[in-house]
A protein has these predicted regions:
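Bacterial N-terminal signal peptides that target proteins for export
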Residues: 1-10
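A short, well-structured beta->alpha microelement
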Residues: 45-65
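Charged, low-complexity C-terminal accessory regions
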Residues: 24, 139-183
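Short beta-strand/loop segments at the ligand-binding rim of alpha/beta enzyme cores
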Residues: 104-112
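A short, gly/pro- and small-residue-rich
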Residues: 81-104, 153-160
């Protein structure tokens, strides 16, 4: 009887682990600009009961069987320095990752959650690169104070969903992930 109970518990644990692993395989998350903002979106994903894989320096060959690439755009000189790369290397990294994601049939969600405080020359360079390759865009309203996201998303034909704050990204993120068959 004891062997049966232990086997049952182990089988149940393996089933739960497999289920969690399959959920984790649906979303991969990476910063574009090396700011810490991607970590905040990982927390939002947890609120949606989704374990996204966060890879700060994700490379094209690091994509697995995910359905969605979420890239959180905000430039950080400190973050780039800690990663040992410059803005040009970061742009090349993201081009490579996005090209590989698109080739695998993945959806690309670009997010900017830092508001006006995360905008500046460096971030704007990354925004110019990111918006045209997005399938959808979620932007905290303060981040579009000058209409840059609106202009770029209209030029690229990308739907932009606003959020009042980082906390308020939960609903638009949920909406996008449902639409894309992840939730």
């Amino acid at each position: 009887m004891r062997k049966f109970t232990i086997r049952t518990i182990l089988a149940l644990a393996a089933t739960v682990a497999f289920s969690t692993a399959s959920l984790a395989a649906d979303v991969v998350l990476t910063p574009f600009g090396q700011s810490p903002d991607a970590m905040m979106i990982k927390v939002v994903l947890k609120k949606l009961q989704l374990e996204g894989r966060l890879e700060k320096l994700l490379q094209a060959d690091g994509l697995q069987h995910e359905k969605v690439l979420i890239t959180v755009v905000a430039g950080s000189s400190k973050g780039l320095g800690e990663a040992g790369i410059d803005k040009d290397a970061e742009i090349e990294r993201m081009r490579s990752v996005v090209d590989a994601a698109k080739a695998k049939g993945m959806k690309v969600l670009v997010m900017h959650i830092g508001g006006k405080g995360r905008r500046g020359t460096l971030t704007d360079i990354f925004i110019d690169e990111a918006v045209p390759v997005a399938d959808k865009l979620i932007v905290v309203e303060g981040g579009d104070f000058d209409g840059l996201f609106t202009k770029l998303s209209q030029q690229a034909g990308v739907d932009m969903l606003p959020a009042a704050s980082v906390r308020e990204t939960t609903e638009p993120l949920k909406q996008v992930l449902i639409e894309w068959g992840v939730l």
